[in-house]
Amino acid sequence: MSSVPDLSIRQFDFDENPETASTLPAATYFDRDWFELEKRRIFRRNWRCVGHVNDIADKGDYVTDAIVDQPVFALRCRDGSIRAFHNVCKHRAHLLLTAPRGTLKSKLITCPYHAWAYDNDGCLQAAPHCESIRGFDKSEIRLDALKVEIILGFIFVNADLDAADLLPQVAPGVDRLVRHLPDLETYRLASSITFDIAANWKNVGDNLLECYHCQPAHKAFVDLVDMDSYSVEVDGLWSWQGGICRPENTAYNLPAGLSELEREFATFYIWPDVAFVLFPGSRAIASFVFGATAAESTHQVFSVYTPDGELDDVTRDICRYFNDVLGPEDVALVENVQKGLHSMSYSRGRFFVDPERSYYSEHAVHHLHGLVFDHLRDFFHGA
């Protein structure tokens, strides 16, 4: 691919000042050639959250995922370490592991197609009848590994083995999360819900990262969170936003007697496609992964982790609120935006920003757009 065909993309110049900037061109939200560039330049070079260490607590446990169209898996190895590989057999490209999660039936990772088997280092150990194949050397064949990093118990993988470590780039946000929940490494999955959304991943991210839409679109949410206390912070590869919640509201009721810290709702976003959400009144944390699957489709997974893997009454009510109210409200919003992005009457919009970083400030959306621009800078201006 030598160029991006849409003229509005080629002529775009990103303004680093959010007060005067315009959003990314509409075509970047549906142009298929542009999405191919994003797959290579963004998703195959950045960190993807694939779960928590306690999702694969025992030796031989695994989880599978996909970095857009690249199947991957993370495995708890026999030495207790966690490793990750491309989930593709080196023989004929069959997926090695086909379930979302499970446990290996033996010490080896065995392809269900022709029974090629690999050890926990990804080295080929068995290939039936290979002794009859001229010049075949098992020792030369191994699965392609991914880089792995564990942050607060959550497993991040990267297809770029030379990628910079993630933690130093998001440490201030991680430190803030630890002040709320210092023992996240011990948490266990309690609930998960998925939404397959007919919208581009950036569209889903834009909606997640601003609360300008909250008053008209999320009546219960603005009854829960005091919008006067809401603020937005951006830095590097992360952003943080949220506010203080009211104990009595129409979303869900908080326990009495909580401190201000315990009543803070917060969204901690890590580039490019994951956020961690704190719901006050609960010791739970939610991971919010909005993984791109195509130019105009996103697979959104909202997973709730708790200290014991169980839902107490408050956390169960939070799940009910997100699953039945807040989540569907946002899905409808972004799907309608996706339709509007195709209109010949729209090319790009303006950011609504407040120097005080209040609830209606779209600083975090501007931050997301800036990161997209940085990763594909040379493809703008007709490059």
Feature map (PLM): residue ranges:
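Non-catalytic accessory segments flanking enzyme active sites
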Residues: 24-67, 72
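Short Pro/Gly-enriched beta-strand edge/turn motifs at strand-loop
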Residues: 45-57, 127-131, 268-272
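C-terminal catalytic domain of Rieske-type non-heme iron oxygenases
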Residues: 81, 87, 149, 154-383
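Rieske [2Fe-2S] iron-sulfur-binding domain
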Residues: 55-161, 165-175, 291
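Generic structural signal for secondary-structure transition and capping sites
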Residues: 43-47, 94, 213
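Short, contiguous pre-domain boundary segments
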Residues: 8-25
